[in-house]
Regions:
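Short aromatic-glycine-enriched beta-strand elements
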Residues: 180-185
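Non-catalytic linker/capping segments at the edges of enzyme domains
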Residues: 49-117, 145-146, 161-162, 174-178, ...
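An exposure/low-complexity boundary signal
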Residues: 2-3, 7-12, 153-175
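Active-site helix/loop of acyl-thioester processing domains in fatty-acid/polyketide metabolism
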Residues: 5-18, 87, 118-142
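Terminal domain-initiation and capping elements
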Residues: 1-60, 78
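Residues located in well-ordered beta-strands
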Residues: 83-86, 151, 156, 170-172, ...
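Hydrophobic beta-strand-centered segment that forms part of the acyl-chain substrate-binding groove
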Residues: 21-28, 53-65, 131-168, 195, ...
Length: 210
């Protein structure tokens, strides 16, 4: 009947908030938008926990999908503030970027003298730039857009990053991009050791609307 069909469409629409296809069977008893949304949120939390700290094996000798020149065709950042050197993987929902942490970087002498440690804010910016590549890679004219931070949450710095490290970041969409709003989870690694992580919200805006 019409009421049952309406409820079924509500379930389908609410579960679409997960941002992934469900491979399985869903049985709904007395569904409603509120309980549907809570169920979708619970599934998203399970997916996030399952993916935590998972980084695929990477071959640093393999030619990257994008080098710095390609990256600069997508995001507006330029040296010395271009913090992502290479993109190793990219899809509609995730990106893996690489940063070679060098002795010659401007912060090395002062943060801290004799014991250089990469500032956490630069690790966040590295993840943000990788996220910018992920998002702007979805539009045909990325040179006409800018990405602005809206919010950072759950940021943690677990281990130090030092000159000589090859820093990897992995960014994943937490939910589909809607109305130019992006919600992402990011992590950085050296080897299989997690260095930092956080969740980020950003918005893409056309330059001519500023």
């Amino acid at each position: 009947n019409e009421a049952a069909r309406h409820k079924l469409l509500d379930v389908i629409g609410d579960l679409a908030l997960i941002g992934m296809k469900i491979r399985g069977k869903v049985t709904a008893e007395k569904p409603g938008h509120s309980i549907n949304a809570k169920f979708a949120q619970k599934i998203s939390e399970v997916i996030k926990a399952d993916r935590k700290n998972i980084l695929p094996k990477l071959d640093f000798d393999k030619k990257p999908l994008m080098d710095s020149n390609h990256i600069m065709n997508i995001i507006p950042h330029r040296p010395p503030f271009l913090l992502i050197d290479e993109v190793l993987e990219i899809s509609e929902s995730h990106v893996i970027g690489l940063r070679r942490v060098e002795e010659s970087e401007s912060w090395v002498k002062g943060h801290f003298p004799g014991a250089p440690v990469m500032p956490g804010v630069l690790q966040i910016e590295f993840m943000a730039q990788a996220g910018g590549v992920l998002v702007l890679n979805t539009v045909p004219d990325p040179e006409n857009y800018l990405t602005f931070f809206m919010k950072m949450d759950k940021c943690k710095f677990k281990n130090t990053v030092v000159p000589g490290d090859i820093l990897i970041c992995k960014l994943e969409l937490i939910s589909p991009i809607r109305r130019g709003i992006i919600h992402m989870k990011g992590q950085t690694f050296v080897g299989d050791e997690i260095k930092s992580e956080g969740e980020f919200m950003a918005k893409i805006i056309k330059k001519d609307t500023l």
